């Protein structure tokens, strides 16, 4: 689909101490109706190199560089599952009515997708950072704290019941998600000889997102509420262990269609928790059981040894605060 945009940028630096940058974007997409086609997305950044101030000179031997920076900006997206012309209804041929006993029918056309007068999904991003260098730039530290507020996220309507007759639920700008976190990088370089240098470094980052609005209808039990949880959270039943006897199976809630032919729990099967106490394990007993497979924490460390034109290095990386759902036979 077609897009059109204008962009402008202005930068200013005074005496390598004070910095300012502004970015302006005006973008349009044919995905949206004419009255919502264009969006304005500004951003700006400020910086202050404190170590370049005259009164900092006495500290240069210890803190050779100190800069504080802040950025704040708005970005937008028009990506709605790859569909063009979101604001227009789409029609397709459908099965017609049947008449008599000869399977005669009259074909017709019906709605396959409903138009939605959606607009740009926007995200406000803020970042506060500090750059530090110590001992004649041998040791450097970078810290960033960030926050993001996404709103008007494209989601299909969920409060509309199935019996309303919609073939497909329409899209709307209703989703809201918050994200926050921080990043840190530390690096140290030491000269070991005339042409020999050793550098060691490490990094750490943490982020956490939270669903603010997802258009879900009111839930029957509090553990079913997805607002306030992370986007990639894993939902399911709580495993209490394994069945150890037939008596335990008989005393436990019925699981997954028990009572029907071929549906019965056996000794050694997983026993799930009946959260609402109704004697049946079903969707009303599902809750948040995991953080999902997108890590909240990333970390790494490494080292480089340079001797003349020859260098060798090593890097170790890892992540945490994530889980995987393993399937298959044990």
Language-model segments: residues:
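Extracellular/periplasmic, surface-exposed regions of secreted and cell-surface proteins
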Residues: 1-238, 305
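Surface-exposed, extracytoplasmic segments of Gram-negative outer-membrane nutrient-acquisition systems
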Residues: 101-111, 149-174, 209-294, 302, ...
């Amino acid at each position: 689909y077609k897009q059109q945009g204008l962009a402008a940028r202005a930068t200013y630096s005074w005496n390598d101490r004070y910095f300012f940058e502004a970015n302006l974007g005006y973008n349009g997409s044919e995905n949206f109706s004419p009255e919502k086609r264009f969006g304005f997305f500004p951003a700006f950044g400020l910086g202050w190199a404190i170590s370049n101030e005259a009164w900092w000179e006495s500290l240069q031997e210890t803190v050779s560089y100190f800069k504080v920076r802040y950025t704040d900006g708005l970005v937008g997206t028009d990506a709605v599952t790859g569909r063009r012309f979101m604001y227009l209804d789409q029609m397709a041929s459908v099965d017609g009515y049947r008449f008599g006993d000869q399977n005669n029918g009259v074909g017709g056309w019906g709605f396959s997708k409903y138009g939605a007068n959606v607009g740009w999904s926007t995200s406000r991003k803020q970042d506060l950072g500090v750059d530090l260098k110590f001992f004649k730039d041998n040791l450097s530290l970078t810290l960033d704290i960030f926050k993001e507020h996404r709103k008007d996220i494209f989601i299909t309507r969920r409060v509309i019941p199935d019996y309303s007759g919609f073939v497909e639920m329409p899209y709307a700008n209703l989703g809201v998600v918050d994200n926050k976190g921080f990043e840190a990088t530390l690096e140290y370089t030491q000269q070991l000889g005339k042409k020999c240098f050793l550098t060691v470094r490490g990094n750490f980052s943490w982020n956490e997102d939270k669903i603010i609005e997802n258009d879900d209808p009111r839930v029957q039990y509090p553990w079913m509420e997805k607002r306030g949880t992370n986007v990639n959270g894993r939902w399911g039943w709580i495993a209490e262990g394994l069945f150890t006897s037939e008596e335990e199976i008989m005393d436990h809630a019925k699981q997954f269609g028990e009572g029907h032919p071929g549906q019965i729990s056996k000794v050694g099967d997983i026993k799930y928790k009946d959260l609402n106490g109704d004697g049946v394990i079903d969707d009303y007993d599902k809750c948040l059981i995991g953080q999902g497979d997108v890590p909240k924490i990333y970390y790494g460390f490494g080292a480089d040894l340079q001797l003349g034109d020859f260098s060798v290095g090593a890097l170790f990386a890892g992540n945490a605060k994530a889980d995987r759902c393993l399937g298959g036979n044990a």
